[in-house]
Protein backbone atom coordinates (compact mmCIF):
# COMPACT_ATOMS: atom_id res chain seq x y z
CA UNK A 1 0.00 0.00 0.00
CA UNK A 2 1.29 3.45 -0.91
CA UNK A 3 1.51 5.80 2.04
CA UNK A 4 2.21 9.54 2.03
CA UNK A 5 3.49 11.29 5.14
CA UNK A 6 1.78 14.64 5.68
CA UNK A 7 1.51 17.22 8.37
CA UNK A 8 -1.70 18.83 9.50
CA UNK A 9 -1.48 21.65 6.91
CA UNK A 10 -0.82 19.49 3.85
CA UNK A 11 -3.20 17.21 2.05
CA UNK A 12 -1.98 13.77 0.99
CA UNK A 13 -1.12 13.55 -2.71
CA UNK A 14 -3.31 11.21 -4.71
CA UNK A 15 -0.92 8.82 -6.44
CA UNK A 16 -3.59 6.91 -8.33
CA UNK A 17 -3.40 7.15 -12.15
CA UNK A 18 -6.32 9.58 -12.17
CA UNK A 19 -4.70 11.62 -9.42
CA UNK A 20 -1.37 11.82 -11.22
CA UNK A 21 -3.06 13.02 -14.42
CA UNK A 22 -4.99 15.66 -12.51
CA UNK A 23 -1.81 16.79 -10.78
CA UNK A 24 0.03 17.09 -14.09
CA UNK A 25 -2.83 19.12 -15.56
CA UNK A 26 -2.70 21.49 -12.61
CA UNK A 27 1.06 21.94 -13.01
CA UNK A 28 0.71 22.44 -16.78
CA UNK A 29 -1.97 25.05 -16.25
CA UNK A 30 0.25 26.79 -13.72
CA UNK A 31 3.23 26.75 -16.11
CA UNK A 32 1.14 28.15 -18.97
CA UNK A 33 -0.17 30.93 -16.75
CA UNK A 34 3.37 31.78 -15.64
CA UNK A 35 4.51 31.90 -19.28
CA UNK A 36 1.57 34.13 -20.21
CA UNK A 37 2.33 36.46 -17.32
CA UNK A 38 6.01 36.65 -18.30
CA UNK A 39 5.15 37.29 -21.95
CA UNK A 40 2.69 40.01 -21.03
CA UNK A 41 5.26 41.77 -18.89
CA UNK A 42 8.12 41.43 -21.42
CA UNK A 43 7.26 44.51 -23.51
CA UNK A 44 7.19 46.63 -20.38
CA UNK A 45 10.61 45.26 -19.49
CA UNK A 46 11.97 46.00 -22.98
CA UNK A 47 10.46 49.46 -23.24
CA UNK A 48 13.16 51.35 -21.30
CA UNK A 49 15.90 49.77 -23.44
CA UNK A 50 14.05 50.58 -26.67
CA UNK A 51 13.54 54.15 -25.51
CA UNK A 52 17.23 54.49 -24.68
CA UNK A 53 18.29 53.12 -28.06
CA UNK A 54 15.83 55.40 -29.87
CA UNK A 55 17.08 58.41 -27.92
CA UNK A 56 20.67 57.53 -28.83
CA UNK A 57 19.66 57.15 -32.48
CA UNK A 58 17.96 60.56 -32.51
CA UNK A 59 20.99 62.22 -30.94
CA UNK A 60 23.31 60.55 -33.46
CA UNK A 61 21.18 61.63 -36.42
CA UNK A 62 20.97 65.23 -35.22
CA UNK A 63 24.70 65.30 -34.47
CA UNK A 64 25.65 63.91 -37.88
CA UNK A 65 23.33 66.26 -39.76
CA UNK A 66 24.49 69.22 -37.70
CA UNK A 67 28.13 68.34 -38.38
CA UNK A 68 27.53 68.19 -42.13
CA UNK A 69 25.72 71.53 -42.07
CA UNK A 70 28.62 73.15 -40.21
CA UNK A 71 31.44 71.48 -42.17
CA UNK A 72 30.06 72.54 -45.55
CA UNK A 73 28.17 75.70 -44.54
CA UNK A 74 24.99 74.19 -45.93
CA UNK A 75 22.43 76.42 -44.21
CA UNK A 76 22.96 80.09 -43.40
CA UNK A 77 21.06 82.84 -41.61
CA UNK A 78 17.83 83.69 -43.41
CA UNK A 79 17.95 80.72 -45.81
CA UNK A 80 14.73 79.39 -47.25
CA UNK A 81 15.34 75.66 -47.58
CA UNK A 82 13.30 73.53 -49.95
CA UNK A 83 13.21 69.93 -48.71
CA UNK A 84 12.34 67.60 -51.58
CA UNK A 85 9.98 64.96 -50.18
CA UNK A 86 9.28 61.91 -52.32
CA UNK A 87 7.48 59.76 -49.76
CA UNK A 88 10.50 57.50 -49.16
CA UNK A 89 12.21 56.92 -45.82
CA UNK A 90 15.22 59.12 -46.64
CA UNK A 91 13.33 62.29 -47.54
CA UNK A 92 10.93 61.80 -44.62
CA UNK A 93 13.93 61.42 -42.32
CA UNK A 94 15.62 64.51 -43.74
CA UNK A 95 12.52 66.66 -43.21
CA UNK A 96 11.97 65.28 -39.71
CA UNK A 97 15.55 65.90 -38.57
CA UNK A 98 15.75 69.38 -40.11
CA UNK A 99 12.53 70.36 -38.34
CA UNK A 100 14.02 69.20 -35.04
CA UNK A 101 17.23 71.10 -35.68
CA UNK A 102 15.37 74.23 -36.76
CA UNK A 103 14.07 74.55 -33.20
CA UNK A 104 17.54 74.51 -31.64
CA UNK A 105 19.72 76.00 -34.39
CA UNK A 106 21.74 79.16 -33.61
CA UNK A 107 20.44 80.71 -36.86
CA UNK A 108 17.01 81.38 -38.32
CA UNK A 109 15.95 79.60 -41.49
CA UNK A 110 12.70 78.54 -43.13
CA UNK A 111 11.70 75.09 -44.34
CA UNK A 112 9.38 74.43 -47.28
CA UNK A 113 8.51 70.81 -48.06
CA UNK A 114 7.98 70.19 -51.78
CA UNK A 115 6.66 67.09 -53.51
CA UNK A 116 6.38 66.48 -57.23
CA UNK A 117 3.36 64.36 -58.18
CA UNK A 118 4.35 62.94 -61.57
CA UNK A 119 0.97 61.21 -62.05
CA UNK A 120 2.37 57.72 -61.81
CA UNK A 121 -0.41 55.12 -61.90
CA UNK A 122 -1.48 54.14 -58.41
CA UNK A 123 0.35 57.01 -56.70
CA UNK A 124 -1.52 57.76 -53.45
CA UNK A 125 -1.73 61.54 -53.96
CA UNK A 126 -3.48 62.13 -50.62
CA UNK A 127 -0.76 60.75 -48.33
CA UNK A 128 1.84 63.53 -48.44
CA UNK A 129 -0.57 66.50 -48.30
CA UNK A 130 -2.29 64.97 -45.28
CA UNK A 131 1.00 64.18 -43.54
CA UNK A 132 2.51 67.62 -44.22
CA UNK A 133 -0.68 69.41 -43.18
CA UNK A 134 -0.59 67.57 -39.84
CA UNK A 135 2.96 68.81 -39.31
CA UNK A 136 1.70 72.36 -39.70
CA UNK A 137 4.56 73.42 -41.97
CA UNK A 138 4.68 75.24 -45.28
CA UNK A 139 4.50 72.82 -48.19
CA UNK A 140 3.83 72.75 -51.91
CA UNK A 141 2.61 69.88 -54.09
CA UNK A 142 3.58 70.33 -57.73
CA UNK A 143 1.52 68.22 -60.14
CA UNK A 144 3.09 67.52 -63.54
CA UNK A 145 2.28 64.50 -65.71
CA UNK A 146 5.86 63.59 -66.60
CA UNK A 147 4.94 59.90 -66.49
CA UNK A 148 2.97 60.11 -69.75
CA UNK A 149 5.80 62.01 -71.43
CA UNK A 150 8.37 59.40 -70.42
CA UNK A 151 6.14 56.51 -71.51
CA UNK A 152 5.81 58.06 -74.98
CA UNK A 153 9.55 58.62 -75.41
CA UNK A 154 11.13 55.54 -73.79
CA UNK A 155 10.65 52.16 -75.54
CA UNK A 156 8.85 49.43 -73.63
CA UNK A 157 11.18 47.49 -71.34
CA UNK A 158 13.82 50.23 -71.14
CA UNK A 159 14.55 52.04 -67.88
CA UNK A 160 12.82 55.39 -67.55
CA UNK A 161 14.90 56.65 -64.62
CA UNK A 162 17.30 58.90 -66.54
CA UNK A 163 14.72 60.92 -68.49
CA UNK A 164 12.34 60.97 -65.54
CA UNK A 165 15.12 62.37 -63.36
CA UNK A 166 15.97 65.13 -65.87
CA UNK A 167 12.35 66.21 -66.17
CA UNK A 168 11.92 66.16 -62.40
CA UNK A 169 15.07 68.20 -61.88
CA UNK A 170 13.96 70.92 -64.29
CA UNK A 171 10.54 71.20 -62.66
CA UNK A 172 12.00 71.41 -59.15
CA UNK A 173 14.42 74.16 -60.22
CA UNK A 174 11.47 76.15 -61.56
CA UNK A 175 9.47 75.60 -58.38
CA UNK A 176 12.48 76.69 -56.31
CA UNK A 177 12.57 79.97 -58.22
CA UNK A 178 8.84 80.52 -57.80
CA UNK A 179 9.03 79.88 -54.03
CA UNK A 180 12.13 82.09 -53.66
CA UNK A 181 14.19 79.17 -52.36
CA UNK A 182 17.87 79.72 -51.49
CA UNK A 183 18.88 76.07 -50.82
CA UNK A 184 17.51 72.80 -52.21
CA UNK A 185 17.93 69.90 -49.75
CA UNK A 186 18.02 66.31 -51.04
CA UNK A 187 17.79 63.12 -48.98
CA UNK A 188 20.90 61.29 -50.23
CA UNK A 189 22.81 59.58 -47.42
CA UNK A 190 26.29 58.15 -46.83
CA UNK A 191 25.54 54.86 -48.59
CA UNK A 192 24.26 56.69 -51.68
CA UNK A 193 27.46 58.73 -51.82
CA UNK A 194 29.69 55.65 -51.59
CA UNK A 195 27.67 53.80 -54.20
CA UNK A 196 27.98 56.76 -56.58
CA UNK A 197 31.75 56.86 -56.03
CA UNK A 198 32.15 53.20 -57.01
CA UNK A 199 29.69 53.50 -59.90
CA UNK A 200 31.83 56.28 -61.37
CA UNK A 201 35.02 54.31 -60.75
CA UNK A 202 33.83 50.97 -62.15
CA UNK A 203 31.60 52.13 -65.00
CA UNK A 204 32.61 55.74 -65.70
CA UNK A 205 36.39 55.66 -65.28
CA UNK A 206 36.30 58.62 -62.87
CA UNK A 207 37.16 59.28 -59.25
CA UNK A 208 33.93 61.16 -58.70
CA UNK A 209 31.34 60.92 -55.99
CA UNK A 210 28.19 62.70 -54.85
CA UNK A 211 29.15 66.02 -53.22
CA UNK A 212 27.53 67.24 -49.99
CA UNK A 213 27.02 70.69 -51.54
CA UNK A 214 27.11 71.89 -55.13
CA UNK A 215 25.87 74.43 -57.64
CA UNK A 216 23.11 72.92 -59.77
CA UNK A 217 23.73 72.04 -63.41
CA UNK A 218 21.70 75.07 -64.51
CA UNK A 219 24.02 77.28 -62.47
CA UNK A 220 21.16 78.87 -60.57
CA UNK A 221 20.75 76.92 -57.34
CA UNK A 222 22.69 75.61 -54.36
CA UNK A 223 21.91 71.95 -53.66
CA UNK A 224 22.74 70.45 -50.26
CA UNK A 225 22.74 66.91 -48.85
CA UNK A 226 22.46 67.24 -45.05
CA UNK A 227 22.32 63.42 -44.62
CA UNK A 228 25.85 63.04 -46.03
CA UNK A 229 27.19 61.57 -42.77
CA UNK A 230 24.17 59.37 -42.04
CA UNK A 231 24.07 55.59 -42.58
CA UNK A 232 21.07 54.18 -44.42
CA UNK A 233 20.44 51.59 -41.69
CA UNK A 234 19.91 54.42 -39.18
CA UNK A 235 17.38 56.08 -41.47
CA UNK A 236 15.57 52.75 -41.81
CA UNK A 237 15.37 52.41 -38.02
CA UNK A 238 14.25 56.02 -37.63
CA UNK A 239 11.50 55.60 -40.24
CA UNK A 240 10.20 52.53 -38.41
CA UNK A 241 10.24 54.39 -35.09
CA UNK A 242 8.48 57.46 -36.49
CA UNK A 243 6.07 55.35 -38.56
CA UNK A 244 6.34 57.52 -41.66
CA UNK A 245 3.63 56.83 -44.28
CA UNK A 246 6.07 55.37 -46.82
CA UNK A 247 5.13 55.49 -50.49
CA UNK A 248 6.77 52.74 -52.62
CA UNK A 249 9.21 54.01 -55.25
CA UNK A 250 8.42 51.37 -57.89
CA UNK A 251 4.96 52.58 -58.90
CA UNK A 252 6.13 53.46 -62.41
CA UNK A 253 7.16 49.85 -63.04
CA UNK A 254 10.75 50.85 -63.82
CA UNK A 255 13.45 48.81 -62.13
CA UNK A 256 16.16 50.44 -60.06
CA UNK A 257 19.44 50.80 -61.90
CA UNK A 258 20.95 47.29 -61.92
CA UNK A 259 24.49 48.61 -61.61
CA UNK A 260 23.59 50.55 -58.46
CA UNK A 261 21.97 47.42 -57.03
CA UNK A 262 25.14 45.42 -57.65
CA UNK A 263 27.37 48.08 -56.07
CA UNK A 264 25.05 48.34 -53.09
CA UNK A 265 25.19 44.59 -52.53
CA UNK A 266 28.99 44.62 -52.89
CA UNK A 267 29.30 47.28 -50.18
CA UNK A 268 26.94 45.38 -47.86
CA UNK A 269 28.96 42.19 -48.36
CA UNK A 270 32.20 44.03 -47.60
CA UNK A 271 30.76 45.52 -44.43
CA UNK A 272 29.54 42.10 -43.32
CA UNK A 273 32.92 40.48 -43.94
CA UNK A 274 35.01 43.43 -42.76
CA UNK A 275 33.05 45.41 -40.15
CA UNK A 276 33.92 49.09 -40.25
CA UNK A 277 35.01 49.14 -43.89
CA UNK A 278 32.12 51.40 -44.92
CA UNK A 279 33.18 54.01 -42.38
CA UNK A 280 36.81 53.80 -43.54
CA UNK A 281 35.85 54.23 -47.20
CA UNK A 282 33.66 57.21 -46.37
CA UNK A 283 36.53 58.78 -44.43
CA UNK A 284 38.74 58.29 -47.50
CA UNK A 285 36.41 60.53 -49.52
CA UNK A 286 37.38 63.33 -47.15
CA UNK A 287 41.14 62.67 -47.31
CA UNK A 288 42.24 63.03 -50.93
CA UNK A 289 45.95 63.30 -51.80
CA UNK A 290 46.13 64.57 -55.44
CA UNK A 291 49.93 64.14 -55.54
CA UNK A 292 49.43 60.40 -55.15
CA UNK A 293 46.95 59.96 -57.96
CA UNK A 294 47.55 60.33 -61.71
CA UNK A 295 45.50 63.35 -62.74
CA UNK A 296 47.91 65.92 -64.17
CA UNK A 297 45.14 68.53 -64.17
CA UNK A 298 44.92 68.27 -60.38
CA UNK A 299 48.64 68.14 -59.63
CA UNK A 300 51.60 69.64 -61.49
CA UNK A 301 53.70 66.52 -62.03
CA UNK A 302 55.60 68.09 -64.95
CA UNK A 303 56.68 71.09 -62.91
CA UNK A 304 57.68 69.06 -59.85
CA UNK A 305 60.94 70.26 -58.26
CA UNK A 306 63.06 69.45 -55.24
CA UNK A 307 62.18 71.74 -52.32
CA UNK A 308 64.26 70.32 -49.50
CA UNK A 309 61.18 70.64 -47.28
CA UNK A 310 59.79 67.44 -45.70
CA UNK A 311 56.29 66.54 -46.85
CA UNK A 312 54.02 64.43 -44.66
CA UNK A 313 52.31 63.10 -47.78
CA UNK A 314 55.58 62.44 -49.58
CA UNK A 315 56.52 58.95 -50.70
CA UNK A 316 59.12 56.96 -48.86
CA UNK A 317 59.80 55.54 -52.32
CA UNK A 318 61.47 52.29 -51.32
CA UNK A 319 59.16 51.41 -48.41
CA UNK A 320 55.80 49.78 -48.87
CA UNK A 321 52.98 51.44 -46.98
CA UNK A 322 51.63 49.49 -44.04
CA UNK A 323 48.01 49.48 -42.91
CA UNK A 324 46.17 48.14 -39.86
CA UNK A 325 45.03 44.57 -40.36
CA UNK A 326 41.36 44.39 -41.31
CA UNK A 327 39.17 42.73 -38.73
CA UNK A 328 37.33 39.72 -40.14
CA UNK A 329 33.84 39.08 -38.84
CA UNK A 330 33.96 36.29 -36.27
CA UNK A 331 37.74 35.86 -36.52
CA UNK A 332 40.13 36.62 -33.69
CA UNK A 333 43.70 37.49 -34.71
CA UNK A 334 46.15 36.15 -32.12
CA UNK A 335 49.31 37.57 -33.63
CA UNK A 336 52.33 36.15 -35.41
CA UNK A 337 55.49 34.50 -34.13
CA UNK A 338 57.91 36.76 -36.00
Curated annotation (Swiss-Prot):
Binds 1 [4Fe-4S] cluster per subunit. The cluster is chelated by three Cys residues, the fourth Fe has a free coordination site that may bind a sulfur atom transferred from the persulfide of IscS. Its EC number is 2.8.1.-. One of its GO terms (biological process) is tRNA thio-modification. It comes from Albidiferax ferrireducens (strain ATCC BAA-621 / DSM 15236 / T118). It catalyses: cytidine(32) in tRNA + S-sulfanyl-L-cysteinyl-[cysteine desulfurase] + AH2 + ATP = 2-thiocytidine(32) in tRNA + L-cysteinyl-[cysteine desulfurase] + A + AMP + diphosphate + H(+). Pathway: tRNA modification. It holds the Pfam family ATP_bind_3. One of its GO terms (molecular function) is tRNA binding. It is an enzyme of class 2 (transferase). InterPro entries: Rossmann-like_a/b/a_fold, TilS/TtcA_N, tRNA_Cyd_32_2_STrfase. A motif (PP-loop motif) lies at residues 86-91. Catalyzes the ATP-dependent 2-thiolation of cytidine in position 32 of tRNA, to form 2-thiocytidine (s(2)C32). The sulfur atoms are provided by the cysteine/cysteine desulfurase (IscS) system. The gene is ttcA. Its cofactor is Mg(2+); [4Fe-4S] cluster. Homodimer. This is tRNA-cytidine(32) 2-sulfurtransferase. The thiolation reaction likely consists of two steps: a first activation step by ATP to form an adenylated intermediate of the target base of tRNA, and a second nucleophilic substitution step of the sulfur (S) atom supplied by the hydrosulfide attached to the Fe-S cluster. It is found in: Cytoplasm. Keywords: 4Fe-4S, ATP-binding, Cytoplasm, Iron, Iron-sulfur, Magnesium, Metal-binding, Nucleotide-binding, RNA-binding, Transferase, tRNA processing, tRNA-binding. [4Fe-4S] cluster binds at residues 161, 164, 252. Its main location: cytoplasm. One of its GO terms (cellular component) is cytoplasm. Belongs to the TtcA family. Coiled coil: none annotated.
Amino acid sequence: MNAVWTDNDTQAEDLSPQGRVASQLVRLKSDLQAFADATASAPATREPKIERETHKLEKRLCRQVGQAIMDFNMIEEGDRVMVCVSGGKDSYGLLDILLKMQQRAPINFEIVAVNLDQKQPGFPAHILPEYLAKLGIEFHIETQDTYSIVKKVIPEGKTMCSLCSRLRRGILYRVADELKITKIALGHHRDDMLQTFFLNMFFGGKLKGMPPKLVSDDGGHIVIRPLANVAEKDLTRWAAHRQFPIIPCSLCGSQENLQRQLIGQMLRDWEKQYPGRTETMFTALQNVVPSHLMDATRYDFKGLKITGVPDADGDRVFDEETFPMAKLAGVQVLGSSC
